[in-house]
Every structure is written in structure tokens, then in C-alpha cells.
Amino acid sequence: MDDDIAALVVDNGSGMCKAGFAGDDAPRAVFPSIVGRPRHQGVMVGMGQKDSYVGDEAQSKRGILTLKYPIEHGIVTNWDDMEKIWHHTFYNELRVAPEEHPVLLTEAPLNPEANREKMTQIMFETFNTPAMYVAIQAVLSLYASGRTTGIVMDSGDGVTHTVPIYEGYALPHAILRLDLAGRDLTDYLMKILTERGYSFTTTAEREIVRDIKEKLCYVALDFEQEMAIAASSSSLEKSYELPDGQVITIGNERFRCPEALFQPSFLGMESCGIHETTFNSIMKCDVDIRKDLYANTVLSGGTTMYPGIANRMQKEITALAPSTMKIKIIAPPERKYSVWIGGSILASLSTFQQMWISKQEYDESGPSIVHRKCF
């Protein structure tokens, strides 16, 4: 497809926005889903200070800004800021006119219906797109892995969900959602670093902790054993240099932080861990298809990027499943972007072209058309 008429694929995550052109093998723009507003009064006249900053620019000026994420737990909570992010995506990052391209957006399953209606309305009424579609994130990840059957455990910054898919059909009754993801782990790491005497409190400092988490954390295969090793030696300790040059040391926090994915009680949550959620999701499916799901468990999203997570999932699900069951955890190296990649594949299929919601259909039916045309 040519760039001039190619569909735009925008995966609006709670933490990062991934955007690009259908048919490409990777997103062209990846930036934080952040809108920042100055905390202080501007005193330098004529500097052209803006009243808000989006994405990387907000991130780089974070020291003087209050940072807000308009998407929480996969649901848009601030539509004005969301519009700013889309505007930034089209005009600054991709440099396209949205009224000239069909737009494929993504959404977490089990989102409130009003969320996708409002997305549809903004695309057609604010950005005047000729056509649009809203796809379920996990389904796109399965496309990207080249499968039509499997269970996707997709964990991003705001929401984790398990979606069983059989021969291309998502099984809605068996989809489970867990509001525990990367942002909660960042907050938890902030908390346990405070116990070590390092204080991180502001929205800007939270971003530093997120970086520590992404660079140094890993999932232990055996948590108790790892705790014992950490207590008896300093072999697991790593140091991290803060932006001001101060160096901090982190030890068992490296694996205690992502352990919360398997033991949500660490965060004071009563829900099941990601391994049990995946298992429960499989158990909600017909007995005849479970075998295929166990053998095709696909990890997707940035929060599945911790070293050791696939081995741990394999171990935990093996312990829950029938003893003779073959279990295979698939963790593609590009899984951070597999939702976007799946969207790029889907939007460039010739068979998909009749699936778009056109401006004409929208004008006839209004925003509720999205429930009829998009799963």
C-alpha cells in the first residue's frame, strides 16, 4: 500500500501510543501517552511557552510539568487530553491529514461501550476520517504471531487481559480482565524503594522509577529461593544512576516488583495472578478446545518483557493443568509491539476492506454503529 492512501494504525495504550501505516512491519511513532502542563508561571516573555506538551516533549520537560495519562486501565478518562494525543499523532508524528486515511484504533476487551462510541465520534467529527475501525488488542497480537487459535495474555501499562481465540473467533464468555499492569508495578516499585530510603513521589520521579523497572527488573522462577539468595549475598544487586548523578543500589526489589503479577496480594489486591487468570480463562472454554489453547499461549504487551516471565508462566500453568497436557508459552521478541503489528496486518488484508465503518454509515447510524461492525 502507498503511504498516500495507506490506512493508519494507532494502538493507544495506557502507557505508550504506537502509530504508523498499515503494511509496515513496525510502528513509525512510539511515544508516551502523556499530556504535561506547566507547574509554574512563565516569566520569560516571547519564549513561546505552550499551555500543554504531548509525548516525548512532555517527557523531556517533565521537571517543570505535571504529567497526566489520559488513558487509565485501558479506558480513556480524559477526552480533551486524548484528542491532544491523537492530534499530535496525526499532525506531528506521522505528518498526515487524518481526513485522507482510514484509521484503525485498538481497545482493551470488556471496555465500557461508551468508550468506543466516543472514539468513533471523535474520529469522524473532529478528525473527519473517511473510515475507521476499532479492534480488540489481544486479537491483533494473535494475528501478529501467525495463529488463528490460541490464548493471548496481553499485559500493558494499564490493563492485563486473557483472550481465548478459536479459529479466529474470540470467545467473549471466557475473556478475563485484570486491572493490574505496568503502571501498578511502577507504583509498587516506588513504594518498595521508599522502604530502602529512596524517595520518589512526583509524577516526574515516577518516570525515573519506570525506567529502573524496565532496565533492571526480572521474574524469578522460584520466588522464595530467589529471596534467600538475595538475603545471603549481594550477587543480585545492581546499581542505577539517577539523572542528577546519584547512584542507587537495588537488590531483591528487582524481582519483588514483577512478582506482583503472580501474587497480586503484594499490591493489596484480592485477584488471581496472571498464571491463574490464564488458566481460568482456558477453563471457561469448551473442553474440546482447551488442548489447543494450552499449546498456544501467546504473551503480548510491554509488561510481558521481563526476563524469566515465559519460564515462570510455563512452570505455573504446568502446575495447574492436567499432568499430561502439553503446554507451550510463546513469547515473540517483538511482543511489545505485537498489537500494532497485528493491526498493520489486519488493515492491509484485502478481505478486511469491507469491514471499515465508512463516514456515510456513521452519518446514517451514529456512534452506535461501532458495536455492530466491530467485535
From Swiss-Prot:
Q: Which residues carry this modification: N6-methyllysine?
A: 84
UniProt entry keywords in alphabetical sequence = Acetylation, ATP-binding, Cytoplasm, Cytoskeleton, Hydrolase, Methylation, Nucleotide-binding, Nucleus, Oxidation, Ubl conjugation
At the top level, the lineage of the source is Eukaryota
Q: Name one GO molecular function term.
A: hydrolase activity
Source species of the chain: Bos mutus grunniens (Wild yak)
Q: Which residues carry this modification: Tele-methylhistidine?
A: 73
**Is Protein biosynthesis a UniProt keyword of this protein?**
no
Summarize the protein's role: Actin is a highly conserved protein that polymerizes to produce filaments that form cross-linked networks in the cytoplasm of cells. Actin exists in both monomeric (G-actin) and polymeric (F-actin) forms, both forms playing key functions, such as cell motility and contraction. In addition to their role in the cytoplasmic cytoskeleton, G- and F-actin also localize in the nucleus, and regulate gene transcription and motility and repair of damaged DNA.
Please report which protein family the annotation says this sequence is part of: Belongs to the actin family.
The UniProt entry's GO CC annotations, sorted and at most eight, read: actin cytoskeleton; cytoskeleton; dense body; focal adhesion; nucleus; plasma membrane; protein-containing complex
Sites where Methionine (R)-sulfoxide occurs are at 44, 47
The EC number on file is 3.6.4.-
Descriptive protein name: Actin, cytoplasmic 1
Q: Where in the cell is it found?
A: Cytoplasm, Cytoskeleton; Nucleus
Pfam families per the record?
Actin
